[in-house]
């Protein structure tokens, strides 16, 4: 089976030739730019030939939708930091 056949078998309740496999890791030097992250993840997957890709954006990416202020560095050795949380008081819950 190729990776697509393997995943389709699992999703349809059939037994694959083996368990689909993937690994993931945070790619801090790319994860703050969607295009760079997608390209890096595809390259990573092609290099190791896993069955599927799990995207790994930086951990706080969804919090900015609620008003969290993030400090973004685009640095291989420095991850995104929360500069100001969306909620710092009970009153903030009414706002969001």
State each model region's role:
Residues 1-96:
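Catalytic cores of TIM-barrel enzymes
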């Amino acid at each position: 089976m190729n990776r697509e056949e393997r995943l389709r078998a699992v999703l349809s309740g059939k037994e694959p030739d083996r368990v689909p496999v993937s690994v993931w890791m945070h790619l801090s030097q790319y994860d703050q730019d969607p295009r760079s992250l997608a390209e890096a993840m595809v390259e990573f997957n092609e290099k190791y030939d896993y069955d599927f890709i799990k995207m790994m954006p930086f951990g706080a990416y969804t919090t900015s939708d609620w008003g969290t202020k993030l400090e973004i560095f685009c640095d291989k050795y420095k991850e995104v930091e929360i500069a100001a949380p969306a909620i710092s008081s009970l009153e903030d819950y009414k706002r969001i």
